[in-house]
Amino acid sequence: VFRFAKDVIVNNNEVIEEQERMAKLSGMKDTWTVTAVKPKYQTYVVVIGESARRDALGAFGGHWDNTPFASSVNGLIFADYIAASGSTQKSLGLTLNRVVDGKPQFQDNFVTLANRAGFQTWWFSNQGQIGEYDTAIASIAKRADEVYFLKEGNFEADKNTKDEALLDMTA
């Protein structure tokens, strides 16, 4: 009983500290200096997939023809990317942010860089969102001009939400 009570208190304190850290991160201004912007295209789309091995996807060299759009689209596919960490949150933190001495600088991320360069930014997610800045990735998302989460609550909030529903948000 004592250990359970102690664990509850410790875990609760860790959650509170993480929420305070996320709120602090949300207020930090980016430090990007953009010297020139010469976009080749009017629209850029970045699709971030997770929890899928590239050898299971045809567009990335897999043996199955299961990615017809990605296999035929006129775009750049990073087929040799290796996750920066074993967990999604840490990997995306190291991938989407500027990293200094091995630590992600959450205020300097690819969304704030695009904003600073004058692009209009949108973030669509099929992940859950518990609070405004519940994770470091949500704090990146919230820096976009337009932000839409399909799910409210944790990532299991509505397991039946299909990625295709993200397309409805673009109409």
Residue ranges of model-derived segments:
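Active-site-proximal alpha/beta segments of enzymes that process anionic O-linked groups
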Residues: 2-46, 51-171
